[in-house]
Amino acid sequence: MKNKPDQLKYSKYQKNRNKGFSTKRNYLIHGNYGLKSIENGFLNFKQIESARKMLIHFLGKSSKILIRVFPDKVLTKKPLEVRMGKGKGPIYDWVSVIKPGIILFEVLNFNYLIVKKAFYVASQKLSIKTEICYE
């Protein structure tokens, strides 16, 4: 998985407010179990990748895992003890904007107990609250 997009129209964007519920990406497509977010927040590449590794560790390579989020938004940050002004700061991190209801991961597996344990361990790696959804 790539940790940032290849090209963007602009290198830096405004942060914007993250409020409301998701009206897209809130249903299962390929899998029969999913990990759904229930609060707002940001997920960076390291969090997504560590959760993916935990899913692979518990589920094995036989079950199909689909990642539905990608870090496509840039966050900037000015260095410590720098006065205000003189432009926007350098790129600090790439994040994915998460709203309540977005499906983060999908799994195609038929044993609910194994999937439940794998999703629990994967959700511990994320900075937002999640729940398991199924068909």
UniProtKB/Swiss-Prot annotation:
A Pfam short name: Ribosomal_L16
UniProt keywords, alphabetically: Ribonucleoprotein, Ribosomal protein, RNA-binding, rRNA-binding, tRNA-binding
SUPFAM superfamilies tied to this protein: Ribosomal protein L16p/L10e (SSF54686)
GO biological process, alphabetically ordered: translation
UniProt entry tagged with the keyword RNA-binding: yes
Record Gene3D superfamilies: Ribosomal protein L10e/L16 (3.90.1170.10)
Coiled-coil blocks: none
Record-level GO cellular component terms: ribonucleoprotein complex; ribosome
InterPro entries: Ribosomal_uL16 (IPR047873), Ribosomal_uL16_bact-type (IPR000114), Ribosomal_uL16_CS (IPR020798), Ribosomal_uL16_dom (IPR016180), Ribosomal_uL16_sf (IPR036920)
GO molecular function: rRNA binding; structural constituent of ribosome; tRNA binding
PROSITE patterns (alphabetical): RIBOSOMAL_L16_2
Family that this chain belongs to: Belongs to the universal ribosomal protein uL16 family.
Function noted in UniProt: Binds 23S rRNA and is also seen to make contacts with the A and possibly P site tRNAs.
Matching PANTHER family: 50S/60S RIBOSOMAL PROTEIN L16, LARGE RIBOSOMAL SUBUNIT PROTEIN UL16M
Subunit details: Part of the 50S ribosomal subunit.
The protein, known as: Large ribosomal subunit protein uL16
